[in-house]
């Protein structure tokens, strides 16, 4: 053991207690939870792989802890020498163990956060971390604050709430790096841990829970963390839909009941109407074809039918409970007539395939008669979707099913009105109200699927059409004015543009067949048609024309997505031009949605300039909409990471410009963030509460507008920030070479975490790289360059220009929510960063003539960090958020081991001349096997690298992603 005296080594438990700050508060059980999980895991590790392997884990942990304490690079080299001496099988076990320990640390944190919330001792404040963030978006507290502090009347709050909509759009962006098999086991570990620390637990319960905990920890460790094949879009959709089944379905009515209670507590004796569109759900899974050739028209059709089948099944599973509950015989005359008619027409043998209420329901139970008919239709709706999905045809006639949500709501509303008329309102407001709210929220399609496609693909189709029609030069070469004129002439006319003889490439067929699928499926399957890389009005008009040509009876609303900096700047003028077109103004009926992209704008210009440009673009778009009398909904394409616009929900909403939310908000919930938002019932409740409360508060108590001098300063700073960012990322001739050497970007695709390719085009530089792998690669090395690059130059410029600007920046931080959130998020990223780790990657992987470039970037990191602290008035990082600070310190030592393992593994993969001396196997399980390391290595028999290296690398990627709690 490298000459160490194991007996003298501190146990990991003791190390933890030395490493972590003292309790942050009286209710702080984090270290206790973490130590228990770790203790159980290390015992399991020893049972499975022997004492030597456990001791190696402890040695690595101790070296990491020593590095974290003093930041001495020599400790990283010591770690490297231990890690590179491991044989392939041991290397996989060790990297898997550290990845597993980080997942356990995350679970301990989640249980601690839930514990702190339960006992309501949470200090109020603006925490920058989602899970540290306080309950200031508690719906009841928000109502009370609006009434008592801001003088709003309860009626004003009720009116605003009834007309408010938050639409959460689940996307399958490949950022969920944890397999579903593991997520489920993690959920059970979380449950066991929470119950173990519950009050009044008996010794027997405790023993059984402890056994369950150990079983689940072992099951998670013995599960292969690595996806051996990439998920298909259908896999992603099923994974996304599983959250509806597990938490969202029951979470929505539960949350709406809490809203009712909160309203009652401010004097409103009415419930939120069941059809108030307070919460809506949409999805991109199977609809987002932007750069993803695997999302075909057939995939879109399949996911729509699958979602309809799942929705019908969820209703069907609930309807019998409702039939049990509504056993009353009193009803209105109108209701009795309907029930008697249904009873007369019912067949005696029609219900044999049901478990409950399988005989003819007597007319003395009228509610059950009506609900029995609803059950029949739900059964047929589900089976018809199943048959269409499996065979493409169904023998169940459409009239035997529910074809639209109004048909479904009608008998339920009839039941509700009848119960209320007969004095049974308390019964009507029970499970029936919950059911009505579910139908209003989820409809028959569970979620509405957005379609997203690149503007260029529509141009290709119209180019083919104009060439086929032989109309002068090709559409692609026309001016914007020429395109608009022709598109409007066609939209105003009636003649079909093309027939079956149109010559089509595969790409053109794909676009047209997608519109065909939209025309064939029920219109409530779909939400918006989003055009990515939109730049001009013709992009929107082109989609309107293609919808008409492909016979879409209820055209989807068309949403331009503005992403790059130049497109954001030009967006208000493009939208104004659209609104000035009479045909278009009549088409939209006073409503327009515009999507703004956080990821690509950040990759294009850096975080500071992107954030400020997004802010200004929203202000200008709102002015344009007001001028033309259009209600504008902003759709925020935020990622999970700060580099892609992520951050705590309530702060993100409250820092938007005044008048840009107006009770209507759409926002993406991406990959890994879905699990953090909806993975557990209490997380689902918290997410719905935060979005609803913050949207209401933004409308009723808008944030302040920035002072003119703040704007002027930030305008200048943004120019400087963009210049520095682009001078490094796009103009430095060897930057791409440095990026590919210093990070695991080239190896990212091996993780199989999504169906979408990591590049828009197979070759090319940073421009062609998607925002997710771009951020992911820098996150892995803990350097986070895309987030902070440009900030330092901007702050330096401002202070150098006038020393008083520092005071102005500090005032902006104190008074302006947008600026505060921007700075706080950067501060959090610095707390998660470590230039010493990035330096190790450089030393091992980057050619010597680029070392000076890396050193210059790291000096920039340190200078930028100090300037951010100065602006925030902080001496240390995260001094205002002790909980997050504690949690990061707890994770750092695990992450450091994985970083060192990753850097040395990349060295072994990339450098054929790098030789290491392996020590004998240390894992007991491997020693007892005649097949040696092949037992673990055979899981990946096709790897092009030396045995075990690829799996070790992927495990380190997953572990670091888990430790930093955001991937891409």
UniProtKB/Swiss-Prot annotation:
By light-reversible phosphorylation. The active site is at 173, 603. It is found in: Cytoplasm. InterPro entries: PEP_COase, PEP_COase_bac/pln-type, PEP_COase_Lys_AS, PEPCASE_His_AS, Pyrv/PenolPyrv_kinase-like_dom. Its EC number is 4.1.1.31. GO terms for biological process: carbon fixation; photosynthesis; tricarboxylic acid cycle. Expressed in roots and siliques, and to a lower extent in stems, leaves and flowers. Belongs to the PEPCase type 1 family. This is Phosphoenolpyruvate carboxylase 3. It comes from Arabidopsis thaliana (Mouse-ear cress).
């Amino acid at each position: 053991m490298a000459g160490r005296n194991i007996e003298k080594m501190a146990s990991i438990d003791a190390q933890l207690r030395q490493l972590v700050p003292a309790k942050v508060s009286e209710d702080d059980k984090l270290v206790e939870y973490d130590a228990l999980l770790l203790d159980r895991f290390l015992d399991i590790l020893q049972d499975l792989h022997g004492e030597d392997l456990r001791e190696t884990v402890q040695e690595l942990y101790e070296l990491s802890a020593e590095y974290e304490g003093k930041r001495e690079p020599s400790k990283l080299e010591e770690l490297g020498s231990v890690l590179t001496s491991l044989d392939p099988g041991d290397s996989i076990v060790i990297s898997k163990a550290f990845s597993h320990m980080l997942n356990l640390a995350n679970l301990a944190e989640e249980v601690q956060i839930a514990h702190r919330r339960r006992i309501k001792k949470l200090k109020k404040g603006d925490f920058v971390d989602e899970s540290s963030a306080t309950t200031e978006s508690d719906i009841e507290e928000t109502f009370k604050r609006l009434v008592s502090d801001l003088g709003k009347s309860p009626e004003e709050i009720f009116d605003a709430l009834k007309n408010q909509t938050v639409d959460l759009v689940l996307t399958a962006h490949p950022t969920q790096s944890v397999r579903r098999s593991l997520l489920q086991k993690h959920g059970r570990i979380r449950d066991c841990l929470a119950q173990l620390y519950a009050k009044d637990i008996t010794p027997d319960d405790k023993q059984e829970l402890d056994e369950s905990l150990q079983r689940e920890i072992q099951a998670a460790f013995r599960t292969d963390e690595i996806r051996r094949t990439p998920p298909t879009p259908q896999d992603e959709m099923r994974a996304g839909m599983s959250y509806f089944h597990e938490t969202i379905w029951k979470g929505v009515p539960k949350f709406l009941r809490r809203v009712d209670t909160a309203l009652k507590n401010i004097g409103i004796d009415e419930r939120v109407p069941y059809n108030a569109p307070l919460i809506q759900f949409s999805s991109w899974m199977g609809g987002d074809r932007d750069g993803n050739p695997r999302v075909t028209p057939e995939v879109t059709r399949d996911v729509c039918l699958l979602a309809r089948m799942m929705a019908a099944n969820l209703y069907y599973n609930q309807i019998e409970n409702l039939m049990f509950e509504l056993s009353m015989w009193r009803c209105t005359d109108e209701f009795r007539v309907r029930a008697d008619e249904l009873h007369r027409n019912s067949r005696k043998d029609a219900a044999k395939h049901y478990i409950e209420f399988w005989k003819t329901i007597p007319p003395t139970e009228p509610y059950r008669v009506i609900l029995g008919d609803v059950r029949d239709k739900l059964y047929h709706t589900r089976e018809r979707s199943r048959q269409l999905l499996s065979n493409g045809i169904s023998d169940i006639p459409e009239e035997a099913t529910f074809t639209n949500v109004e048909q479904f709501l009608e008998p339920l509303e009839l039941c509700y009105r009848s119960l209320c008329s007969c004095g049974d309102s308390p019964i009507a407001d029970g499970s029936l109200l919950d059911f009505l709210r579910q139908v209003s929220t989820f409809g028959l399609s569970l979620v509405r699927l957005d379609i997203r496609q690149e503007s260029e693909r529509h141009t290709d189709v119209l180019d083919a059409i104009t060439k086929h029609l032989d109309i002068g030069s090709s559409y692609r070469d026309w001016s914007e004015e020429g395109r608009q004129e022709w598109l409007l002439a066609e939209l105003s006319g009636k003649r079909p543009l093309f027939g079956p003889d149109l010559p089509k490439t595969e790409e053109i067929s794909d676009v047209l067949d997608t519109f065909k699928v939209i025309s064939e499926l029920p219109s409530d399957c779909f939400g918006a048609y989003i055009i990515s890389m939109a730049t001009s009005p013709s992009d929107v008009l082109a989609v309107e024309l293609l919808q008409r040509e492909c016979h879409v009876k209820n055209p989807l609303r068309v949403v331009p997505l503005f992403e790059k900096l130049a497109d954001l700047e030009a967006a208000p003028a493009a939208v104004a031009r659209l609104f000035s077109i009479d045909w278009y103004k009549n088409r939209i009926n006073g409503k327009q949605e515009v999507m703004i992209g956080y990821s690509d704008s950040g990759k294009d210009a850096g975080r500071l300039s992107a954030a400020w440009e997004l802010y200004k673009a929203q202000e200008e778009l709102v002015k344009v909409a007001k001028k033309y009398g259009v209600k504008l909904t902003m759709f925020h394409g935020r990622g999970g990471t700060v580099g892609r616009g992520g951050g705590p929900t309530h702060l993100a909403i409250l820092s938007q410009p005044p008048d840009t939310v107006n009770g209507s908000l759409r926002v993406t919930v991406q990959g890994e963030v879905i699990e953090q938002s909806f993975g557990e019932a209490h997380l689902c409740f918290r997410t719905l509460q935060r979005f609803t409360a913050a949207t209401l508060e933004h409308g009723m108590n808008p944030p302040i507008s920035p002072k003119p001098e703040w704007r002027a300063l930030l305008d200048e700073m943004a120019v400087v920030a963009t210049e520095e960012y682009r001078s490094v990322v796009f103009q430095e001739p060897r930057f791409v070479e440095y990026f590919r050497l210093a990070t695991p970007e080239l190896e990212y695709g091996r993780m199989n975490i999504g169906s979408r390719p990591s590049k828009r085009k197979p070759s090319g530089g940073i421009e062609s790289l998607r925002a997710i792998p771009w951020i992911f690669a820098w996150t892995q090395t803990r350097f986070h360059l895309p987030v902070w690059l440009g900030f330092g130059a901007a702050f330096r410029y401002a202070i150098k220009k006038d020393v008083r600007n520092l005071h102005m920046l500090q005032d902006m931080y104190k008074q302006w929510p947008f600026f505060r959130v921007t700075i706080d998020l950067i501060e959090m990223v610095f707390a998660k960063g470590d230039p010493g780790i990035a330096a190790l990657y450089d030393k091992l992987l980057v050619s010597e003539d680029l070392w000076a470039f890396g050193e210059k970037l790291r000096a920039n990191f340190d200078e930028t960090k100090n300037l951010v602290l100065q602006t925030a008035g902080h001496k240390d990082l995260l001094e205002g958020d002790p909980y997050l600070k504690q949690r990061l310190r707890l994770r750092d030592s695990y992450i450091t081991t994985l970083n060192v393992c990753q850097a040395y593994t990349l060295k072994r993969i990339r450098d054929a001349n790098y030789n290491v001396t392996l020590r004998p196997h240390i894992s007991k399980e491997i020693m007892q096997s005649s097949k040696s390391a092949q037992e673990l290595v055979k899981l990946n028999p096709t790897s092009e690298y030396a045995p075990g290296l690829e799996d070790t690398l992927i495990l380190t990627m997953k572990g670091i992603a888990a430790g930093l709690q955001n991937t891409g």
